[in-house]
UniProtKB/Swiss-Prot annotation:
Family: Belongs to the SDHAF2 family.
UniProt xrefs under InterPro entries: SDH, SDH_sf, SDHAF2
Organism encoding this protein: Aspergillus terreus (strain NIH 2624 / FGSC A1156)
Keyword field: Chaperone, Mitochondrion
Protein name: Succinate dehydrogenase assembly factor 2, mitochondrial
Cellular localisation: Mitochondrion matrix
Length: 295
């Protein structure tokens, strides 16, 4: 190899970082010496009262379990001064306080049910509701022919606003509406002015036996699953609604009798009309197609 080639190679090798000795390399790392808890320029990292505070907190009984549905604005809730105490201070204010069961299957706890209710009527009339002082009067229609009334009642049966009433009344109207005379149509018109949940329970509930509790009761399904997961008792299927008696104005109603027969005929379990068939009731699985009434 000629001298002219060796000189450039030696120059490149000396300029390479690998050729720099290890002793001349500079490290850019940094390290900090951690002081002990009670050492250092800023003093101790934990306050001097920490052991005493820890001993004070561990000696107290645990705070009561407070579900997210328990209101702190009730009269029996412990107070700290003028305002209600936060949940973490309950064991200091009243160690023996136990919050009442917030639910028995109703939502009255959120809507003022803790307050003392006033005098209630034994039976609410048409257009009356619990907790209101006014009366919702239904619309009065005059000069309506039978065909128009059937079409309107079919619409009102299908558009109730809740799924249970939609399925119940739409299937009922599909079977019976075309067969009703003018007097039955007028009675059915007045019946649809009732509260949707009242109609649903009047048609689906049987008279209770003696000793049955007159309030909503949690189901076994909720006790196995929802009670452990913190699920509300208002969830669908979590409670069995209390029996709602039929008011005297509908006790002898032909429309209500037909509606209850319609429920029994379509029931999948437990009703006599379904047992008399070779196969059980088909249920109320879907809303039927719209009928067109010629007369």
């Amino acid at each position: 190899m000629s001298v002219s080639r060796m000189i450039p190679r030696l120059v490149r090798a000396s300029a390479s970082p690998m050729a720099v000795p290890t002793a001349f390399r500079r490290s850019f790392g940094s390290s900090v010496v951690c002081a002990k808890d009670n050492d250092g320029p800023r003093g101790p990292s934990t306050p001097s009262t920490a052991p005493e505070y820890r001993q004070n907190q561990t000696s107290k009984p645990p705070n009561q379990f407070m579900p997210n549905s328990t209101s702190t604005m009730t009269n029996d809730y412990p107070k700290v001064g003028e305002k209600a105490s936060p949940p973490e201070l309950l064991n200091s204010v009243d160690p023996n306080y136990r919050p009442a069961d917030p639910y028995s299957g109703k939502v009255q706890h959120f809507t003022g049910g803790r307050q003392e209710p006033g005098a209630q009527k034994p039976e609410l009339g048409l257009g009356e509701m619990e907790g209101i002082t006014f009366k919702v009067e239904p619309l009065q229609r005059s000069g309506e022919d039978t065909t128009t009334m059937r079409a309107r009642l079919l619409y009102q049966s299908r558009k109730r606003g809740i799924l249970e009433s939609d399925l119940l009344l739409s299937t009922f109207a599909d079977v019976y509406l075309a067969k009703m005379n003018h007097e039955q149509l007028q009675e059915y018109d007045r019946f649809l002015d009732e509260n949707d949940w009242d109609i649903y329970y009047w048609a689906t509930q049987d008279a209770p036996e003696e000793g049955t509790p007159a309030e909503d009761t949690p189901t076994e399904t909720w006790q196995r699953t929802g009670a452990k997961s913190g699920e509300w008792r208002q969830t669908i299927g979590a409670f069995k609604a209390a029996y709602r008696p039929v008011p005297t104005r509908w006790a002898d109603s032909e429309v209500l009798r037909l509606l209850r027969e319609h429920v029994r005929d379509n029931s999948a379990t437990g009703f006599h009309a379904a047992k008399n068939k070779k196969t059980g009731g088909s249920g109320l699985g879907r809303m039927p197609n719209i009928q067109v009434f010629d007369s």
